[in-house]
Structures are given as structure tokens and as C-alpha cells.
Amino acid sequence: MNIVLSYIGPLPEYTIDCIKQIRLFNTTSPIYLILDDIESQYIKQLEQYNVTLISYETVKHQDFLNLFETNKKQFSILEDLGVRKFLFMRSIERFFLLFNLMQQRSLTDVLFMEIDNTIYDDPSLWLEEFSQNDLCFMFDNEYRFSSGIFYTKTANSLIPLIICVFTNARKHICWYSDMIMLYELWDTNFSNNISLLPTHTSFVSSEHEFFQNGISQKIPLNILTYMNYGKFGDTIFDAAGMGVYLFGCDPCHSKGVIIHNNSEKTWSHIKYSQYEYKWERDSKNRNIPYINFGDGKWIRINNLHIHSKDLKSALSI
């Protein structure tokens, strides 16, 4: 397995926390970090984790940049976010950077993580199930899928995604993001070797109408949350809802304040604040999160999407 991260812009300090957490559970898999802030003050600290730094200039995708230049309104540039104003564009561009990196280095079996995620198991243990598919990611809500934890078998596995972006980007009025992109990819390719990681053990919810080759197919949204539960043992993944509840949302949504255990932000289809949580130390004294869905069974959480960027509070050691 190869692990790839990407951040374009001033490298945030929590990058160190993300990679430190990965190395707590996996000391051998190569980690690649795509960045343009090659003079970052945090580079020296990253060296201890055996990270290969990839300059943005060596993997940037000019065709995507041309698409962005001619369709800026669709990507919603958020001036209020300052240096993060290209958030939505970067959220999609990173898949093009990944594609170029995988081609250049002949990488396969890639775990592509968002930097504001913390993992709580060795991701190489997921590879046997991951590799049964071309792509793996998560359902979060209607019209929104999550790539906090994202797997791709080969560079060619990303081609349907790239085609999807070039096909659909111009159609959007605004707010085109990676979550919408993945929904559209699933909407047109959901029977074509894409797997959704389990984010629940069972859940009752409404139906959603997908179209496959122009033919309507209604799929209950609950199936998208647990259709693959059990393939990773008694564990689930976090698309966003658990991390948002436990460690807060991005301070830009809460007047600059990080609020833990906040049930007000419920962007996810599932309201995870209704469930019970606990942390337990494993045999190596690493703190691991668990969730109880009300049936008395504690389910291990493989990752948390720390939307607030307060990764330090979510570290295992």
C-alpha cells in the first residue's frame, strides 16, 4: 500500500498530526505528500516520519487548471477564507495531482487521505478488501459523498473520475466540490467496481433515485451507509459526521470557536450525535474510538474526519 496526502497552500501544522497518527499504526508503507509550500517551517518535523515530499510543480495538471480558469464561478472562490479561498477547487484538483503522481511513479493500491483525518488502525489491513474494487469512498448525504478515506487501485481507476469532472464542471452554477463530484461519479458508475465504505451497521432512511444508462433505479440511502458493513470486521469509517460531532466543525462555521460534542451541525445524512461513544486503549496504549448504535455493541471507528482541524485532540497518544 502507498499513502498519499495533498495540500496546496501554506502547509498547516495539523499535517504533522495527521502523519504522526498514520505512523502510530503503520511504520512501513510509503507516504507521499504533495505540496507547493516547499519552504514550510514544518518540513523538518516531517522528516522523522519518512515522508516523500512531492513538489506541486512536478504533478500539476494543466488541463484541469485550464478548466478552472474558464469556469471559476462554478468552483466558488471564497474570499472570506483568505489563503484557503480556493478550497473547493483544490478539493477536486488533488485527484488530478494524484493521477499524475501515480503515473509518474507507477504507484498502485493508493490510500488517498484528506489531511484533516486521523486513522485508528493499520490501513494495510484494509487493503485486501479495498483491492477488490477500483475505487472506494464514503456516502455522507444525498448528493454528497466523502473522500476523507479514498482508495484507488491504479491511475487508470481514476479516469472515470477525471472524465466526470470535465463533463460536469461547466454545468454547475456554483459550489462544485469533491463531495458533489463523487456523488456524480457514483450516480453514473455505481455498478462499475466502486465500493462504498461502511459508515453505519444498519440505518433506516429515504430512497434516492440514481440513473444508470438513462434508466431510473431507486436505492434506499440506508443501504449506502451499511451495504459493506462486515467486510472490515466490526468496524466502520467516518465520512464526516462523527468527527464533526466529537471535535467540532471548521471554526469558519462557528465564529472562530471550536465546540466539541456539538450536535447543532448535522450536515451528514445520519445524526451521529444521537449515539454513544467511548475511547479505549489497545495493547500498545493507543487510544481508539468506538461507537454504540443503541444495541449494546461497541463498533471500532477506523478514522475520524476532524473538520475543526483540531487533530491534536484526536490523537491516540
Place the predicted regions along the sequence by residue.
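Secondary-structure boundary elements
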Residues: F25-T28, N100-L111, F130-Q132, K153-L158, ...
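Conserved glycosyltransferase catalytic-site signature
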Residues: F88-F95, W175-I180
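N-terminal anchoring/stem segment of glycosyltransferases
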Residues: M1-D80, Q103, T154-P160, K278-I317
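Catalytic core and acceptor-binding pocket of nucleotide-sugar-dependent glycosyltransferases
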Residues: I159-I317
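Surface-exposed cleft-lining segments at the edges of enzyme active sites
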Residues: L81-L87
